[in-house]
From Swiss-Prot:
Belongs to the HPrK/P family. The keyword ATP-binding applies. This is HPr kinase/phosphorylase. The lineage of its organism: Bacteria, Bacillati, Bacillota, Bacilli, Bacillales. It is an enzyme of class 2 (transferase).
């Protein structure tokens, strides 16, 4: 699912001052990439990225002021198209009257901010990348365990929320329960968050819905987290062979990214919170180049080889 971001959302998020073209605030912003239209102001229109937010800083405005009035008017008309989501003036600079008049005539939102050009560019790009990223929703619980984003999945009633509650009591942080919104950013990272309606809430059968932040404090929750590991909880199946060494490397595809997947069988007496906690720590160790399962397999192979040599 692809989200739609409109210029009005950018204005609200970054507290921008709207100077002209308010009727165009409903225009969609189709890409997180911004445009510094220096070449357009210089008269080269061939590759004008008119569907991007246009950012005019000190360099562009200084050059624009050096043009004749006729050229300023011409370039302003080129800037303001039906597809242009908006024009942003940075550093609080005065707005050339030609740009203001053409923006108003074409209903192109003309905005201004006191922020430095490079700073506001970076902030808006990050905001748009997150909002426009491909998104899906999955049933599960997302918890930050020792800095590792662990998505706990499983059938309804298997104990996901109860396990998350125990993890929160052990000092870890809840991101989302029941429904996890997952966005894939430009660098193929999966970032999970909770829908606004159920943010910081946890459903425990027999108790009901609890507010984790109210009960355990602000340190027990976070708004979003990169998903690094998926743990699938399933009822113990005596006829199924589960990985007992750790050499199996399974993954699960979410959008376009593959995420490591562990399957943990559930049966009475197993402390799932501790097991998942250890799984997160083991994942961190593997990222540091320490793989206990592979080291054990290597030692075992060496021992067998030595034994065969003695025969």
């Amino acid at each position: 699912m692809q989200n739609i971001v409109r210029t009005a959302q950018v204005v609200e998020r970054f507290k921008l001052q709207v100077i002209a073209g308010e009727e165009g605030l409903h225009r969609p912003v189709a890409t997180p990439d911004l445009s510094r239209p220096g070449l357009v102001l210089a008269g080269y229109y061939t590759h004008y990225a008119k569907n991007r937010l246009q950012v005019l800083g000190k360099t562009e405005l200084t050059f624009y002021a050096s043009l004749s009035e006729e050229k300023r008017r011409e370039r302003a008309k080129i800037l303001c198209t039906e597809q242009t989501p908006g024009i942003l003036i940075t550093r609080g600079f005065d707005i050339p009257k030609e740009i203001e008049e053409e923006a108003e005539a074409a209903n192109v939102p003309l905005m201004r901010t006191n922020a430095v050009t490079t700073s506001i560019e970076s902030q808006i790009t990050n905001f748009l990348e997150m909002e426009l990223a491909p998104m899906t929703a999955m049933h599960g619980v997302l918890v930050d365990i020792y800095g590792v984003g662990v998505l706990i999945k499983g059938q309804s009633g298997v104990g996901k929320s109860e396990t998350a509650l125990e993890l929160v009591k052990r000092g870890h942080r809840l991101v989302a329960d029941d429904s996890v919104e997952i966005r894939q950013t430009g660098d193929q990272l999966l970032v999970g968050s909770a829908p606004k309606l159920i943010r910081h809430l946890l459903e425990i059968r027999g108790i009901g819905i609890i507010d984790v932040m109210t009960l355990f404090g602000a340190g027990a929750v976070r708004s979003h987290k990169k998903i690094s590991l998926i743990v699938n909880l399933e009822n113990w199946d005596a006829g199924k062979v589960y990985d007992r060494v750790g050499l199996d490397h399974n993954t699960m595809k979410i959008i376009d990214s593959e995420v490591p997947l562990l399957t943990i069988p559930v049966r009475p007496g197993r402390n799932l919170a501790v097991i998942i906690e250890v799984a997160a720590m083991n994942y961190r160790l593997q990222n540091m180049g320490i793989n206990t399962a592979e080291e054990f397999a290597e030692r075992l192979a060496n021992a067998i080889q030595d034994t065969e040599g003695d025969l």
